[in-house]
């Protein structure tokens, strides 16, 4: 077995986040290091086909694949998908996005919602099997919307292929440069697609150049669109370089603004913005934003609270799914408490959403977040909601916890994808709280941290997941831990 060899096989399962486990057979004479029954295939007397397991990403259980060996590290093999020879029995979904297969955004649109939930639940059980063998798993709660659920999209300007026409949308699957014009995207409200199409058509008609990421020349970079699920308020933010004369730019942007204001939208376009970004990185960066029309913010409602959102705010991208998630966090935090907690720590608090949801049931909530802009937003939203018992501190949890005067009765953990710093988790354990609620968007990081917490005397009492991002690999997990 060597790199470049081409095999066929069946996907037996998919491990989190998108690692298809493929069983393939190869002729004994070509097996090389592949083992079968303790013996290397190809040795004298072995004429049976060898079975080999290969990881092929972005696949679905039950699919028959043709793939090439891309990496070989000892007994570990990774393949690159060449062709799907036969669909899986799980692929029975109707009304599939027209961009599925090209666009790199969704993996599982051809699977039914029920099949997606079953697959993700199985992934969680496999991950937790060794760390929590007696796991009390309460199930995978679905997003209230399986389509049109996202409240934010960052579309990229580029070419559909090298030296091809301008496109505006998502990166083509497996490509850093090619862009798919995702004007029929199914995971956003149709208003998003109207803004995208109008923007692309307008700048195409004007002959405006897009930013070439290799040559670092051009004007158009990104289109950021937000739409609140509850209020219907929308923001459209055009991100460009400064590679245009001021007078020409003002006329160009005025025409774009008028184009959007004339659109027949179901929601209300509350603000049209222009952001400058001359950084080399292919990421949205705010180097100065001006309001072309309306307001620089929109408002969204979650569990009876109101949140102000800018184009660049960190806010859960599925508002209705966030209500399910945060509802479970609140349930776990307050379950069977004899009295309300005096002090709650919300560590890695982001824009303070969880802290504010729990504020009515505590004397004080202290949020700690390393991103200063998020802390400022949290303070502003707490004022907006009339919550005077929330304190938000900007800083690294690893350092800030050393200076916190209060002793918490309850700790909420909602860290970034990679989990909690090993030194920080030791300091969190040292508070000795009876109850911790851990919220995670990456279960592989979660199980690593749970092992540390369990070794320190905590026990996982309840666990559930929320399918926050249907048709993608994303899973949100909530764990209730109590000190033994």
Model regions and ranges:
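Terminal RNA-binding accessory module
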Residues: 1-95, 99, 173, 391, ...
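Rossmann-like S-adenosyl-L-methionine
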Residues: 2-3, 8, 13-16, 25-26, ...
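Short, acidic/hydrophobic/Gly-rich beta-strand patch recurrent on exposed beta strands
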Residues: 20-26, 169-172, 237-239, 378
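Short, conserved phosphate/pyrophosphate- and ester-handling motifs at nucleotide-, phospho-/glycolipid
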Residues: 62, 188, 318
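Extended interfacial segments that mediate partner engagement and assembly in macromolecular machines
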Residues: 85-95, 101-210, 230
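Short, solvent-exposed loop/turn elements at beta->coil junctions and helix N-caps
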Residues: 139-146, 213, 222, 226, ...
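Internal alpha/beta scaffold segment
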Residues: 177-221, 242-273
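Carbohydrate-binding surface patches
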Residues: 224-228, 233-246
């Amino acid at each position: 077995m060597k790199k470049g060899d081409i095999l066929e096989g069946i996907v037996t399962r998919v491990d989190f986040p998108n690692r298809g486990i493929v069983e393939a057979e190869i002729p004994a004479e070509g097996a090389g290091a592949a083992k079968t029954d303790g013996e290397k295939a190809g040795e004298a007397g072995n004429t049976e086909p060898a079975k080999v397991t290969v990881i092929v990403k972005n696949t679905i259980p039950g699919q028959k694949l043709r793939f090439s060996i891309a990496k070989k590290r000892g007994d570990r093999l990774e393949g690159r998908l060449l062709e799907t020879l036969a669909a899986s029995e799980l692929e029975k979904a109707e009304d599939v996005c027209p961009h599925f297969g090209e666009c790199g955004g969704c993996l599982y649109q051809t699977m039914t919602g029920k099949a997606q939930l079953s697959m993700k639940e199985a992934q969680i059980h496999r991950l937790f099997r060794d760390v929590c063998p007696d796991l009390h798993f309460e199930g995978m709660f679905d997003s209230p919307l399986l389509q049109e659920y996202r409240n934010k999209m960052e579309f990229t300007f580029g070419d559909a292929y090298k030296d091809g026409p301008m496109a505006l949308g998502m990166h083509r699957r497996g490509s850093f440069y090619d862009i798919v014009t995702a004007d029929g995207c199914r995971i956003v409200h149709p208003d998003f697609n109207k803004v995208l199409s109008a923007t692309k058509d307008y700048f195409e008609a004007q002959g405006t150049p897009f930013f070439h990421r290799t040559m670092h020349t051009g004007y158009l970079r990104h289109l950021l669109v937000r739409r609140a699920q509850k209020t219907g308020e929308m923001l459209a933010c055009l991100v460009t370089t400064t590679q245009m004369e001021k007078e020409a730019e003002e006329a160009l942007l005025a025409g774009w603004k008028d184009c959007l204001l004339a659109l027949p939208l179901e929601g209300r376009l509350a603000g049209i913005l222009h952001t400058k970004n001359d950084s080399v990185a292919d990421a949205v960066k705010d180097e100065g934003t001006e309001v072309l029309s309306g307001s620089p913010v929109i408002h969204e409602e979650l569990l009876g609270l109101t949140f102000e959102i800018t184009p660049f705010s960190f806010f859960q991208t599925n508002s209705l799914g966030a209500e399910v998630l945060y509802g479970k966090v609140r349930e776990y935090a307050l379950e069977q408490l004899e009295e309300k907690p005096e002090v709650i720590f919300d560590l890695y608090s982001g824009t303070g959403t969880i802290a504010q949801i729990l504020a009515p049931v505590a004397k004080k909530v202290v949020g700690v977040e390393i991103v200063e802009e998020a802390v400022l937003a949290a303070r502003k939203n707490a004022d907006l909601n009339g919550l005077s018992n929330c304190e938000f501190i900007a800083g690294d949890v690893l350092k800030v916890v050393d200076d916190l005067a209060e002793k918490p009765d309850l700790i909420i953990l909602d860290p970034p994808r990679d989990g909690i710093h090993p030194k920080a988790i030791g300091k969190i354990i040292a508070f000795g709280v009876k109850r911790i609620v851990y919220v995670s968007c990456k279960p592989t990081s979660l199980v690593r941290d749970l092992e540390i917490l369990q070794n320190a005397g905590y026990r996982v009492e309840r666990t559930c997941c929320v399918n926050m991002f249907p048709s993608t690999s994303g899973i949100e997990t909530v764990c209730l831990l109590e000190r033994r």
